[in-house]
Amino acid sequence: MTGHVFTIAGGKGGVGKTTTAVNVGVAMQDAGYDVVIVDADLGMANLAAMLEIDYDTSLHEVLAERAAISDTLTEGPGGVTVVPGEQSLEAFADADPAKLRKVIKTLSNAYDIVFIDTGAGLSHEATVPLGLADSVLLVTTPDSVAIGDAGKTAQLAKRVDGEVIGTILTRAEEQSEIDEVETGVDHPLLAVIPEDSEATTNEPLVVNFPDTAAAEAYHHLATALERVLKGESVDTIVEEETEWFPSGDETEEEDEDDDSGGVLGLFS
């Protein structure tokens, strides 16, 4: 039985694709799955830099037929395996995105779960991972441009036979922002990740700051994806989320004790 391939995509840069791949990957490793995270952002790879890990061989070298995928496997935080990318323009020029198919097939035969972290835009190298996925996860912020780009990515995924199973909203603080995403992206909302000042600077949050609302949200997402792997429908999972933010008297009482904002009430 081959592993499940999740492609993390979104169109716009800076929405939290890499952060999501890292945190949900570590969370699922912690849940007992053997996980590998692939930095397929061929133009601006940043996974290794974000995690501050050293590596000997990059994915770019494999795609340029100068190394084997086994040479790239690097130990990451929380026990996950990382396939790092390279940042030089020369490496980008030599890498052939079409060879990513063989790489992902090899990894899916060796791991329970493969997370593909993709680049921004709708270029060829950003499109290839969409067609290789068993499931595509869209990541967006409440920003209207990001929402629009996520929608375009979903359309592109459909053209290359990629199945988008849901959307992950980052940096949301109000119900109105959730409504905008659900209207702008025609796919179920699987998770809401609150803004966290430690994100992108002290990753992974689920290891370094496990008690934060953001870390809890990533674990919540990992649980949802685990249910997907076990055959539950996304609609069933999403229907159980009656509200992403607390409301009414409970919220007012929390606000009296903590004036730091509604996102701290996520998933309570």
What feature does the model see in each segment?
Residues 10, 40-109, 201-204:
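P-loop/Walker-type NTP enzyme "switch/lid" segment
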Residues 109, 113-201:
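Conserved catalytic-core segment of NTP-binding enzymes
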